[in-house]
Amino acid sequence: MSTYPPETLDPDYDDGTMPSNVDTLAEAVVGQRIVTVEKDVRIHDRYYGTRNATVITLDNGKRVSLVNTDDCCAYTELEAFLLHPERVDHIITGVGTTDGFTRWHIYADMGDVLELTVGWSSGNPFYYGYGFNITVEEVSA
């Protein structure tokens, strides 16, 4: 089973936003299977009308959307993802990170199911917002 020890960053560099983002994603995906992953999907946004997101569709009929953020010099951006189709039949058991929250791992008993490459900066700590906007919604029929 893959596990990743929790990362800890200097409090001058991150105010807990990144670990909170990982926890939010884990709450949405653990115990489920990934059906699809799509990048640059237009989704409804309560503030901006629509925005692009990376959308993970799960076997429980829910869609988890990760929306990039940018606020002046602070940002969080999904740069790339790698889905391991040979492992999508396995139930997700956790979400971990490596390399200072720049590599995110959604994993199951047989290893990573989905790997995310994430660029991020807290900018001028902590005046500007950063971290993914993560939403979970039911897939409409």
What are these regions (language model features)?
Residues S2-A141:
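Surface-exposed, interaction-prone regions used to assemble/regulate multi-protein complexes
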